[in-house]
């Protein structure tokens, strides 16, 4: 069935049907719902080339990855986000354009995407403090949604984020309630906004209990298994080692676990571990009973939400930038237990 045949069945003009299918704001919701239902009932799929010609849209969304953060591409967290976003694009007949560029060429890439009309919008990843990409995208008029937030940015922008500060505050409070006082923070790179918010939550929880933070127990590195292992081994070798670790990802938490076991210790009995982002499609945190206690948020769902938000901005430009703050659940697993009494295990 083509567009003309669908319009004939509905008793509407092809232009109205096309505008309803493509999210034009001047089409009222009753008509839009009627058109969408008929398209689904008759298994109508719009011709992407025809849509591009009719609307002037590229029917594509961009994701620009600087080489400095190219490890993101093989990170299962990034992969889950892209999978969630991709599901939304596919349902709406949008393509995904993934560009890996040098850091020096990032601004030029955004400007080129805009000037050539290769994409209708972009999702911005790994926001930093006062991220210069946000005012740039506003300046060139390219619709965008930020996965995360950028503290210090004076430019209004659309974003989807997890409440990282509250998640790490709750996790630290849980460990404190178990009697732990030497709690190590294995954080991500702290030029990124999410990592700063996680450290803030950790520090807030310690301050509320009157515990002074120990710089020797706080680290900021890439969230890899190797770095988690290296940090865990170094901290456990201290004269007064931590009795608990709070890791910014399941992957770095796995490295911490390896360091614990190499010393003949048992995770959950001798040393407790809490991780973040355990709800990954291809790296599950156990089955019936979680292996790790975790602050859980679905990165895949965040990808879906960000993509839906961006497509809404593309369909109805000029609206106020929307925001969505997702809360993380605290999932109790086998990796945490009461702080050991007596001398710290070595």
Give the label of every model feature segment.
Residues 60-64, 68-173, 177, 237, ...:
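Alpha-helical recognition/docking segments in bacterial nutrient-uptake
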Residues 13, 59, 120, 181-182, ...:
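Short acidic/polar active-site loop segments enriched in Thr and Asp
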Residues 67-80, 98-107, 160-170, 186-233, ...:
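Hinge/beta->alpha junction and helix N-cap segments in small-molecule ligand-binding domains
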Residues 181-182, 213-217, 267-273:
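Short acidic capping loops at alpha-helix termini that bridge into adjacent secondary structure
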Residues 1-60, 343-346:
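N-terminal helix-turn-helix DNA-binding module of bacterial transcription factors
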Residues 7, 124, 246-248:
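Short beta-strand scaffold positions
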Residues 233-234, 238-346:
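Flexible loop/turn connectors
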């Amino acid at each position: 069935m083509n567009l003309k045949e669908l319009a004939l069945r509905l008793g509407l003009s092809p232009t109205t049907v096309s505008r309803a299918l493509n999210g034009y704001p001047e089409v009222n919701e009753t008509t839009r719902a009627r058109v969408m239902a008929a398209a689904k009932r008759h298994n109508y799929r719009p011709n992407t080339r025809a849509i591009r010609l009719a609307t002037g849209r590229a029917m594509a969304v961009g994701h620009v990855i600087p080489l400095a953060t190219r490890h993101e591409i093989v990170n299962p967290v990034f992969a889950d986000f892209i999978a969630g976003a991709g599901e939304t694009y596919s349902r709406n007949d949008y393509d995904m354009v993934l560009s890996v560029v040098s850091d020096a060429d990032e601004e030029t890439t955004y400007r080129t995407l805009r000037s050539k009309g290769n994409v209708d919008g972009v999702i911005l990843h790994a926001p930093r403090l006062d991220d210069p990409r946000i005012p740039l995208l506003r300046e060139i008029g390219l619709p965008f949604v930020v996965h995360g937030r950028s503290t210090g940015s004076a430019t209004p922008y659309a974003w989807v984020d997890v409440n990282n500060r509250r998640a790490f505050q709750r996790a630290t409070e849980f460990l404190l309630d178990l009697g732990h006082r030497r709690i190590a923070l294995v954080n991500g790179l702290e030029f990124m906004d999410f990592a700063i918010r996680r450290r803030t939550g950790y520090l807030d929880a310690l301050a509320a209990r009157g515990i002074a933070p120990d710089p020797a127990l706080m680290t900021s590195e890439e969230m890899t298994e190797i770095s988690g292992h290296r940090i865990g081994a170094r901290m456990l070798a201290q004269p007064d080692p931590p009795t608990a670790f709070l890791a910014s990802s399941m992957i770095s938490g796995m490295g911490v676990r390896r360091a614990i076991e190499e010393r003949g210790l048992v995770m959950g009995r001798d040393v407790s571990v809490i991780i973040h982002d355990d709800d990954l499609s291809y790296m599950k945190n156990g089955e019936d009973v979680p292996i790790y206690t975790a602050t859980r948020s679905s990165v895949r769902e965040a990808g879906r939400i960000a993509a839906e938000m961006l497509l809404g901005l593309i369909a109805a430009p000029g609206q106020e930038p929307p925001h969505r703050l997702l809360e993380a659940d605290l999932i109790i697993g086998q990796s945490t237990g009461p702080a050991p009494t007596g001398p710290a295990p070595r």
